[in-house]
Amino acid sequence: DYESYHIRLIAKLIGYEFPKGITAHQHLADLYGTDYETAKKITFTYLYGGLDDNARKIPFFQKVEGYVRELYKKFIISGRLTTPLYKREIHFSKIEGATEQKVFNYLLQALETEVNYMKIPKVLDFLSDKKSKMVLYTYDAFLIDTHPSERDEILGHLPTIMEEGGFPVRAYEGTNYNNLVVID
């Protein structure tokens, strides 16, 4: 599971660096003066619902706001949105009712897909000679059905692959998807 995946993708886009040794959500929680769970809700409200005066005082959101405005301006002028990694072009007509926020969301979803698209072959290559298999991919997590004899090797190597590019991960385990617990 990627830690604060959307937030970290956005940080890459805008050139913002989160402090080392702390999650992105905790960093923002400290700036808001709230607990972690409340901060997550606040952050996503700001990112997908717009900024208020409090958010505009936070350097991360100042950069986000500038980036979103510039992205939208380029989109309106060029008539297309170009994805960051694969340079795919999404034509104006494909984004119905385009707003600053909607165009940004399209870009962010495209970026998460492109980053994962680059990581999946590396994960599959690592697992190719193993009994363990990747059985599910979501936007911010890969589910590996891990053979017990390979657990330590998987935990020792897979996070390195997943964290390439500066995206920290947390590993969970359990007998099924509904009872996963974090591995410390």
Task: Report residues per predicted region.
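Polymerase palm active-site segment centered on the conserved acidic dipeptide of motif C
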Residues: P148-D184
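Helical catalytic core of nucleic-acid polymerases
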Residues: Y2-E100
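Short glycine-/aliphatic-rich beta-strand segments at the starts of folded cytosolic domains
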Residues: E96-Y117
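Hydrophobic alpha-helix feature that most strongly marks membrane-spanning transmembrane helices
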Residues: L47-Y48, I120-S128, H147, E163
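Catalytic palm active-site di-aspartate
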Residues: D1-Y2, T43, K133-T146
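Short, flexible loop/turn elements at secondary-structure junctions
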Residues: Y2-H6, E112, P148
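Active-site palm subdomain of RNA-directed nucleic acid polymerases
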Residues: V115-T138, F142
